[in-house]
Amino acid sequence: GLWQKIKSAAGDLASGIVEAIKS
């Protein structure tokens, strides 16, 4: 549902931030 899409998008954003910090 919509909530799952929101959680997925938030997870992708968080992963991107983590990768940016690590690199």
From Swiss-Prot:
Expressed by the skin parotoid and/or rostral glands. Belongs to the frog skin active peptide (FSAP) family. Caerin subfamily. It is found in: Secreted. One of its GO terms (cellular component) is extracellular region. The keyword Secreted applies. Keywords: Amphibian defense peptide, Antibiotic, Antimicrobial, Secreted. Antibacterial peptide, that adopts an alpha helical conformation which can disrupt bacterial membranes. Each caerin displays a different antimicrobial specificity. One of its GO terms (biological process) is defense response to bacterium. The lineage of its organism: Eukaryota, Metazoa, Chordata, Craniata, Vertebrata. This is Caerin-4.2. It comes from the Eukaryota. It comes from Ranoidea caerulea.
